[in-house]
UniProtKB/Swiss-Prot annotation:
Organism: Xenopus laevis
UniProt keyword Zinc present: yes
Family matches, as Pfam families: LIM
Gene that produces this protein: lmo3
Cited InterPro entries: LMO_RBTN_TF, Znf_LIM
One of the GO BP terms on file: positive regulation of transcription by RNA polymerase II
SUPFAM superfamilies in the record: Glucocorticoid receptor-like (DNA-binding domain)
Protein name listed in UniProt: LIM domain only protein 3
One term of GO molecular function: DNA-binding transcription factor binding
Key words of the record: LIM domain, Metal-binding, Repeat, Zinc
Annotated ranges, domain LIM zinc-binding: 22-84, 86-148
Entry's Gene Ontology cellular component terms: nucleus
Keyword Protein biosynthesis on entry: no
Amino acid sequence: MHRREQSFGIQMLSVQPDTKPKGCAGCNRKIKDRYLLKALDKYWHEDCLKCACCDCRLGEVGSTLYTKANLILCRRDYLRLFGVTGNCAACSKLIPAFEMVMRAKENVYHLDCFACQLCNQRFCVGDKFFLKNNMILCQTDYEEGLMKEGYSAQVR
């Protein structure tokens, strides 16, 4: 049977002094701290709710945890282990699922690879780029090619 991954919220709760201490799902000891975490319908010490891979404290990293294959994971490790990867359209190397990317039509690029494929000029926010035969071109190289060949591309 195929189990789907799930993400769950993490709540930080203040412990009221007059309430009976709750048991921690991580260490099975009573939680006597000022704050506790609630996740997966269980209560946790702040130090006990950790990513199974990197040991980061999930209450500090964000408000979401991920579970799959009986593991409790932070977002980065969840994506690293179970996320979909692809290849960069410029360098053909693998792009990890957790890495930031740039997209142009159906092409996906590493941030460092998102540059004119003729002159290697990196693009800044707001710069125009053109697609010609799945190549990214800066405006200068596109216009030079247009003058030489009379081709057209799609402006992005």
